[in-house]
Amino acid sequence: SCHDLLEIMLETCPEGMFIPAHIWTPHFSMFGALSGFDRAEECFGELTPYIHAVETGLSSDPPMNWQLSALDRFQLISNSDAHSPAKLGREANLLSGDLSYYGLKQAVETGEGLDGTIEFFPEEGKYHFAGHRKCHICLSPAEAEAQGGICPVCQKRLTMGVSHRIAQLADRP
């Protein structure tokens, strides 16, 4: 489990950083529609205070994440996947502190020296909207709700997108 993985990391390397990545990816990420977690505390339990940052993923940006007051205690970072050279650097973090492991750790833990993120367009993310890849369907949260979460082409369940999941959990505009 996520809790157990964090516990192992803390036992093995107390100076380590544990940053949940791609927190909104629909299937099995921390806040994915199928994860079973609506809050970090549900995922990490009593170890939640050791989580200082979350990585937002390509399909969301900081303003989308700011809709959840439950994320206020975390630094928001944005990293690029390294699946191909063309995708490197699409997202990045702006750092002004000491460029060392401990400087990065301080920025992640306190926000000092973490000056923001460089973001790609969330709409370009594979999971921004709800959809069904096989049928080439991509729907906004309102459209997905109107369809009852069902693909209008094949009648199978849609994969609910990041924007839909954030709307479900948001407690402010």
What feature does the model see in each segment?
Residues 10, 14:
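Internal, well-ordered alpha/beta segment that forms a basic, Gly-enriched binding/recognition surface
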Residues 7, 26-173:
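Charged catalytic cores and adjacent phosphate/nucleic-acid-binding surfaces used
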